[in-house]
Amino acid sequence: MALSDADVQKQIKHMMAFIEQEANEKAEEIDAKAEEEFNIEKGRLVQQQRLKIMEYYEKKEKQVELQKKIQSSNMLNQARLKVLKVREDHVSSVLDDARKRLGEVTKNQSEYETVLTKLIVQGLFQIMEPKVILRCREVDVPLVRNVLPAAVEQYKAQINQNVELFIDEKDFLSADTCGGVELLALNGRIKVPNTLESRLDLISQQLVPEIRNALFGRNVNRKFTD
């Protein structure tokens, strides 16, 4: 039985409605899938950027902490250096004051002669030569001449060896020198300074740790007292 035009139109409309519905469902499915993929990608990108931001600020925070530690360490070191500078200046002041007082030793002739004798004998033990030239301040020549016999006897008594001492009356120690002697042997190739200043310098090197301890107390953090 042949379909009428109305039936044909009806079937066509039905087919078109079905196709349209299927197309709409497919479109909705595609949209839903696209939105899901978009949300997943968006979430991934957001998380990625969040991690980057967190990593950036963690790095910045560590840099700030490190900078704080460096600044704190620098400030602490500077403070320590300032304290050390003040202490060293004070120690130097004590030694400078001692140097200024050296000249007072020479004002007492008897005491100074005793000192000169000891300085000459000490120098002889260092130089250990049979012929020695003594150099002193011009003003001290008479005093040195007076103590030569006693110095020679003390030296001979210790090592049982004779020594000839000569006073250099051409070249003298500077008048600015506080006193003491300089010993020379072998045409000046051996020289032993034993002035009051040189003795103070030697003693001060040995006593600086003790001076520091006396002025500021012992540093419990140091194992050695150099």
UniProtKB/Swiss-Prot annotation:
Pfam families: vATP-synt_E
UniProt xrefs under SUPFAM superfamilies: V-type ATPase subunit E-like (SSF160527)
Keywords: Hydrogen ion transport, Ion transport, Transport
GO biological process assignments: apical protein localization; liquid clearance, open tracheal system; proton transmembrane transport; terminal branching, open tracheal system
Cross-referenced Gene3D superfamilies: 6.10.250.1620, ATP synthase, E subunit, C-terminal
Gene Ontology CC annotation, any one: plasma membrane
Example GO molecular function: proton-transporting ATPase activity, rotational mechanism
Organism superkingdom: Eukaryota
The family this protein is said to belong to: Belongs to the V-ATPase E subunit family.
Function summary: Subunit of the V1 complex of vacuolar(H+)-ATPase (V-ATPase), a multisubunit enzyme composed of a peripheral complex (V1) that hydrolyzes ATP and a membrane integral complex (V0) that translocates protons. V-ATPase is responsible for acidifying and maintaining the pH of intracellular compartments and in some cell types, is targeted to the plasma membrane, where it is responsible for acidifying the extracellular environment.
Complex formation: V-ATPase is a heteromultimeric enzyme made up of two complexes: the ATP-hydrolytic V1 complex and the proton translocation V0 complex. The V1 complex consists of three catalytic AB heterodimers that form a heterohexamer, three peripheral stalks each consisting of EG heterodimers, one central rotor including subunits D and F, and the regulatory subunits C and H. The proton translocation complex V0 consists of the proton transport subunit a, a ring of proteolipid subunits c9c'', rotary subunit d, subunits e and f, and the accessory subunits VhaAC45 and ATP6AP2.
Name of the protein: V-type proton ATPase subunit E
